[in-house]
Structure formats: structure tokens, C-alpha cells
Amino acid sequence: MIITTPRRANMSSESGSSASTVHYAKPVLRHVPMPSSTTPSSIGSSSSSSSSYASSTKQTPPRSPVIRYPTVVVSKNSIATPSSSLTPQGTPSYAVPVSRNQMQYSASKLQYEHMRHRCKMLDDENQKLMRMQSDVVNDANRRVQMHVNEIRMLKEDNRKLAISNKELRDLSCFLDDDRQKTRKLAREWQKFGRYTSSLMKQEVDSYHQKMVSIEEKLCTKEREVDELRQLCMYLDEQRQSLMSNAAANVDCDNESEDLGCGSSEQSGGSEGHNDEEKHHEFNKCFNKHKESTLRRIMATSMCSEPSEEEERREVSKRERSRLLGYIQSLENRIKHLEMSQNHESFWNSSSNVGSDCDEKTIIERGWLGEEVMSNSEDCHLELKPVMTTSSTSSSHIFGNDKCPMFDSMTSNMTSSGCTTYASSGTDGDSVFVIGDEIDIGNLEVRTLSRIDEEATSASDTLKESARMPPKIAPPICSSLVLTNFDNMSEDCAPRLMRSASETCRPTTTLISSTQPAQRSVSVEKNNNNNVHTHN
């Protein structure tokens, strides 16, 4: 009989090594008929049965895990067959001890022993399987723990990446906003640049036009300045020629007075001849082209724009006020010097020779006396002055309206306009030399050099006059009236008081200029002889 046990059975472990319950299947008992004698037929039948069982076992595939259980072959014969022939292929065979008295052992007892041994083996196998299962479970738990840790790490990395992704998204949004703002700002700057470039182009064009106009005006001003310079030179020549003519007239008058008694016809003829010569020389000294240019300039100045005329008037008013202040200061200084020098008298010569020191004011003569003495031998004048004999000093009238004479107190108060040499009442002569009377604003201040004296005592007189100014008498009724001074009214015309010599009588000199082309002079002499000169 063959007893086969399945893989599992339901029983409790007797050894007590494991407290767990293991379920096993019930054993299957198979009866194998065995012949009474060992015949070849019986052997063949047994071998065939074993081979059939082996084939049946071979046909069924093994399960995983493959566990093979031992089989026990129990035979009633006394002769035991070899295990290799009775057991299937690949299954171990176990020898069950059988007593010699075969009748004593029953089938149930053999089954019990077999079951007991089998249960012990199954328990060991179960323990082995439990150990294997625990190892597998531990390994699975270890792997699960490793995977859990890996998942945790991946989650942490994912969280960090999400945070960095959010930061990058915010940064990209910020950069995009900044880019949009920059683009808007760039467009605004581009518009502003276009506007400024167009504005700068307009400004450059306007300034270029202004520069061109200013250059044109500068060229015209330069031409006008050249013309005015030439005209000034021409006027200076006219003044010098008129002064020389006046000196010649004075000499002729003196000669006519000496030859007047007893020869009236001869003196009359000589006077007519002299007048013709003077008129001819007077016409020679005039240049028609320059005179026409001068008239044109005066006409254009009269027809100038009202704004320029107003500016010119304001400038002339300021200059006039400065001129009046300067003249008043000079008068105050003159009064002070008169009061301080009344007790001194050293000017006792019978004649007064005109010089450049005489054409200066008293203050300037006191300040520049030493300089005139040092330079008296070096400087010369081209024309000779008008000389009059007198026991007192000469009085000079200067008119100028230029700014340079206010800048320096040592400038010569002379002009190209008028110069008067007045003598005392001893000889009864008075000479007035008139130049080119133009508008006062157009007069030029210039420094005159020393005049060469004709008298023998000129150098002595110059040194003496440079050391100390002459004695001045108290102010009298002599006055200088300037009319048509920028169209001023007569009540606003300045009346300047002057001081004359001790023996000089009241003398009035009137200079009137109503038009630029007209010149009028009236001189009242002390000897009741009126001399009128009209140019």
C-alpha cells in the first residue's frame, strides 16, 4: 500500500516550537496489490504500476514552490523490494521498520507512525517556510520602506521645484512687466528725441538766420563806421581849415584897423580882394561828396525808427545828465580854487598866449601840470592857434556829449565843434571860431597836443601856466545857451554859469542849431561892434 501526503494538512504542532496554526490536507491512502510470491509477473505489474504513477506524476506540472513529499511502500511479503523500483522517480524512499512477526503490526498502527513522522517533517518544513516567508516579508518591507523614502524625497524635490517654478514664473512676469514699461519708456523717449531734434533743428535754423542777419548788420555797421571815420577826419580837416581862416581873418582885421585912417578906398579895395580870396579858399576846403554823404546820414538818422529814436533819446538824456553833473562838479571845484587862491597874484604879463593848457580846465591844469612840462618839448600841432593880447586869462567853451570824458577826469574838454578865445576889454577884440556844428551826441572827444607858440615867451608862459592856474574872478553873467539839444524846450535848456577875468565885461555867446545843414553864430563884442558870421 502506498501512502501519499498532499502539500498541506490541518493539524497542530506537537513540538510547541511554533504557536501558529498550519492547515494541511488529509493524507491519501492507496492500496497496491502485491503478489504472494516474487514472480516476474508480479514484479512487472508492480513496475508497470510504478511507471504509470511516475508518468501520471510527470504529466502533472509541479507547483511553485516545488515541494516533494516522501512516499512509504508497505508490502505484506517478507521480502522487501528495493526502494528505487517501488518509488516514483525523483522521490526519496524511507524504510519503515517492520518486525519479523508481520502479523503483529496492523495497517492502522503503521499509518499512525507514518502520520506522526510525516507531521514532524511537515512541521519542520512549515517552520522553514515560515522563516522563508518572514525573510521575504522583511525584504518586502525593506523594499517598501526604501520606496517610501524615495517617494518622500521625490515629493520634497517636487515641492522645491514647484516653489522655484513659482519664483521663476513671478520673476518672468516681473521681467515682462519691466520689459513692457521699458518699451513704453523707449517709445516716449523716441518721441521726445524726435521732438527735441526737430526743435533743435528749428532753433539752429533760427539762430543761423539770426547769425546771418547779425553778420549783415555787422558788415553794414563796419561800413558805416568807416564812413563815419572818414567823415570825422573830414570834419577835423574842416575845423582846422576854419581855424586857420579865422586866424587869417584876425590878422587882416588887425592890419585893416592899422591902415584904416586916411586910406578908406585902398582899405575897401583890399578888403574886397581879401573877401574873394577867403571865399575861394573856403569853397576849396569843402568836399561835395563828403558833404552829400553827411547830409544823407543826417537824413537817415532823422528818419530812423521810433524805437531807435526813443532809445537814442534815452541814451542822450543819460549822457546829458552825466554831463551836467560833471560840469556842476567842475564849477564847485572852480569856486573852491577861486576862494583859496584869491590872495595870490602872479599873472602880471601883458599878453596871454593860447596853448593846450589853456584849453584844459583849471582842475586838469593843476593835475597835469608836471606831465605837460615833461612833454612840452616833444609834442607838436600842425596848425597855429589864434592869439589875442590881453592882460587877463582867456575863457574857453567846450561842448561834448560823449561817454569817454566821464570815464577820465584828465581828458581834454575839447571838441571838433567850437572853441572861443575871448580877450579882455583893453583891445576890445573878441574872436569866435566855429567848427562844424552837428548834433551834440555826435561830437568826438579827442586829446589835443601842444600848440606851437609864435611869441618869444611861449615856453616861459607854458611853464608858468602849468605850475599854477590863473587867477579867476567871481562868477558873472556870462552864460552858454545850447538849443535844439535833442529837441528840448527852451525852459529845459541848461544855462551854465561861467567865470570870466577881472576886467572882462558881460559877454553872451549863443550857439543855435535848428537844422544839421544850417550853422548860425552870433558874437557880441565888448566894444559895441557886432560881428555876425553865418555859414
Swiss-Prot record:
GO cellular component: adherens junction
Domain of life from the UniProt record: Eukaryota
Pfam annotation, one family: CCDC85
Positions of the UniProt region annotated as Disordered: 1-67, 254-277, 503-535
InterPro entries attached to this UniProt entry: CCDC85 (IPR019359)
S-S bridge residues: none
Biased composition (Low complexity): 36-57, 526-535
Outcome of gene disruption: Mutants are 97% viable. However, the Rho GTPase-activating protein, pac-1, does not localize to adherens junctions.
Residue ranges the record marks as coiled coil: 109-172, 198-242
Keyword Coiled coil in annotation: yes
Location(s) in or outside the cell: Cell junction, Adherens junction
Keywords for this protein: Cell junction, Coiled coil
Family the entry assigns: Belongs to the CCDC85 family.
Functional note: Linker protein which helps to recruit the Rho GTPase-activating protein, pac-1, to adherens junctions.
Designated name of the protein: PAC-1 interacting and coiled-coil domain-containing protein 1
Gene giving rise to this polypeptide: picc-1
